[in-house]
Design a protein with these regions (language model features):
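Short, solvent-exposed secondary-structure capping/transition elements
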Residues: 158-163, 209-218
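Short, hydrophobic/amphipathic alpha-helical packing segments
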Residues: 96-106, 193-205
Length: 266
């Protein structure tokens, strides 16, 4: 499968975020193996692609998603059966001020995740969720860093508690008999900046897991996880069903209804 490689620099692409490209998917609808192969070969998964971004200060690794990254997200959504077609965001100055403020709010130990291997926080609309994290690899295919994508259209319309309430309600059908509300911030910080800060913390957890033995790589099938690999934190809650090529919760027997639902797409 040949994936087209773009030559434009990240900075130029970010400045031209208003011009949205039309992406032609390289695989037939529903052909997940084809999409997975295309994603693995995509420039956005390579360290070389992120080199221009990594050469800039961490505070400048923010902005509308470059075209290659948007294309990669189209592939990921198609591989997972999501209908959304992401497009680069047009970001207002006040929104970006909230993003920078949310990053500044993070504890120093967390901000250290924004290191030399962190390729930045990039924004799209119509992601199909609020946040997305993936890794990029060196020429030998070894993961060496990560990047985050956030949906600016979603974050732009919610305060922290409103976003959390919306997210917690997504697995359930509305009913007059009950109501679910979530509170993640006090009244003084229940704003858009608080929502951005919360989802950044979540996605940074994924970034921090790269190359740290927290859990198996998410870009390989469970059946292909090396049998000799050890993941002490992962083992507290999960096992690898190699025959079924899936991860199985050790709590499945006690919560049989959980396997019938889909509870989270960040």
């Amino acid at each position: 499968m040949r994936i087209r490689v773009f030559g434009a620099a990240i900075a130029a692409l970010a400045m031209a975020a208003g011009a949205q490209a039309a992406f032609e998917l390289p695989c037939k609808a529903g052909d997940r193996p084809c999409f997975i192969q295309a994603m693995r070969a995509h420039p956005a998964r390579s360290a070389a692609f992120w080199k221009p971004s990594l050469s800039r200060p961490v505070t400048e690794r923010l902005g509308p998603a470059p075209a290659e990254l948007v294309e990669f997200l189209h592939l990921d959504n198609a591989a997972n059966g999501f209908p959304e077609k992401p497009r680069a965001s047009r970001l207002s100055a006040d929104f970006m001020a909230d993003v920078r403020g949310a990053i500044a709010d993070l504890p120093p130990a967390v901000r250290r995740a924004f290191d030399a291997t962190f390729a930045g926080v990039w924004f799209v609309d119509d992601l199909g969720g609020t946040g997305f994290t993936d890794m990029y690899s060196d020429a030998s295919g070894n993961p060496v860093g990560g990047f985050i994508v956030l949906d600016a259209a979603v974050l732009g319309k919610f305060t922290a508690n409103a976003w959390a309430t919306w997210k917690e309600n997504t697995p359930f059908k509305p009913a007059k008999a009950w109501k679910l509300e979530a509170r993640i911030e006090g009244a003084a910080t229940d704003d858009r900046r608080g929502a951005i800060r919360y989802i950044l913390l979540h996605e940074l957890g994924h970034v921090l897991s790269i190359n740290r033995g927290v859990h198996p790589r998410w870009d390989i099938p469970p059946a292909e996880v090396p049998a000799t690999a050890r993941f002490p934190f992962f083992d507290l809650s999960w096992t690898i069903d190699r025959k079924g090529d899936r991860y199985a919760s050790i709590f499945d027997a006690g919560f049989t209804a959980v396997r019938g639902g889909r509870f989270l797409k960040c």
